[in-house]
């Protein structure tokens, strides 16, 4: 399976940076150059707590996402360069449900559905990626490189949630609940884990011929 993406990472010529923050998270970027060495590093933090609080379910939501990426280069000889690309991503999700209430039906036949819940869910997803490349420029039109990369992923999902259902007629104007139509209970449990490790070593070559590039 091939990709049409051709990503080129920038090399800063001096010190640069930026940062921003909001109710949904924050991000920062810094780049620098000191002759033979350059680096660009970015950091992002996101949270969806305020967005998820608008759902029908009364619960404690605490999802957060952290992403760190860096790209470093070092030219140790006129035609030789070594670079490193690294990425770390950590996603956490915590959910403690309390109640859920939904009304549906028509004006003359309105129903109310309630769920009283207990328990919690905790999920965690971590990925770590690193790639080291040794690059040699034979001339202006020819480039050779040796790459080694590693990827590891860790996914954990666990929850123990119980719910008591109640279905009844919605309250009439000026009155109380009329009738309980149905009562039920459910339990959900899960312990899912997935760990994976992938390593790769490869060699590449690039030849530029007028308006064409051969890889």
Q: What is the role of each PLM region?
A:
Residues 1-16, 28:
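N-terminal periplasmic accessory domains that precede
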Residues 5, 17-19, 41, 146:
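Well-ordered beta-strand positions enriched in small/hydrophobic/aromatic, beta-favoring residues
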Residues 9, 23-25, 34-36, 45-49, ...:
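Transmembrane beta-strands of outer-membrane beta-barrel pores
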Residues 11-13, 22, 76, 138:
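Short loop/turn positions at the edges of beta-strands in beta-sheet-rich folds
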Residues 22-26, 33, 64-66, 124-128, ...:
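Residues that define the transmembrane beta-barrel architecture of outer-membrane proteins
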Residues 35-123, 159:
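Periplasmic-side early beta-strands and strand-to-turn transitions of outer-membrane beta-barrels
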């Amino acid at each position: 399976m091939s990709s049409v993406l051709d990503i080129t990472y920038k090399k800063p010529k001096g010190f640069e940076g930026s940062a921003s923050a909001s109710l949904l998270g924050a991000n920062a970027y810094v780049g620098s150059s000191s002759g033979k060495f350059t680096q660009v590093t970015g950091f992002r933090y996101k949270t969806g707590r305020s967005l998820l609080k608008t759902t029908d379910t009364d619960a404690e939501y605490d999802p957060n996402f952290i992403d760190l990426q860096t790209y470093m280069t070092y030219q140790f000889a006129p035609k030789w360069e070594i670079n490193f690309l690294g990425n770390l991503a950590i996603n956490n999700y915590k959910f403690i449900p309390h109640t859920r209430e939904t009304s549906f039906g028509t004006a003359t036949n309105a129903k109310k559905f309630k769920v009283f819940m207990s328990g919690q869910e905790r999920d965690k997803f971590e990925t770590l990626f690193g790639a080291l490349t040794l690059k040699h420029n034979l001339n202006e039109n020819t480039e050779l490189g040796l790459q080694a990369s590693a990827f590891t992923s860790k996914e954990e999902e666990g929850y123990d949630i119980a719910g008591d259902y109640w279905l009844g007629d919605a309250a009439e104007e000026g009155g109380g609940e009329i009738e309980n139509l149905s009562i039920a209970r459910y339990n959900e449990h899960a312990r899912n884990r997935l760990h994976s490790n992938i390593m790769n070593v490869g060699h590449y070559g690039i030849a530029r011929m007028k308006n064409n590039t051969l890889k």
